[in-house]
Amino acid sequence: MEYRYLGASGFRVPVLSFGTGTFGGQGALFSAWGSTDVAEARRLVDICLDAGLTMFDSADVYSKGAAEEILGEAIKGRPRDALIISTKATFRFGDGENQVGFLRAGPGVKPPVSPE
């Protein structure tokens, strides 16, 4: 797998990322894309890692959070420092004032990296 640096950030990432939009299949939009369960997600993660693809893209808005939960189960037991998990932090997740943007990020979440 070819890797490149993300802008001037010094962060080295693979040229490909695996998207988890099909994980969960909840809601009208995401059920139309697919409904990958945990067992299938584990199989897909294995295929990615065998090919050297270590970056997985998800978002809390994918299938109402189910995609992130399924990805978490699929990578459980793997060395976390060997994986890159990207997400979105600007979409509205609910109606509350703190349910949008980076304000809701927990203590284990690193600040966004700008590609510039």
Predicted regions and their residues:
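Glycine/proline-rich, positively charged
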Residues: 27, 33, 96-116
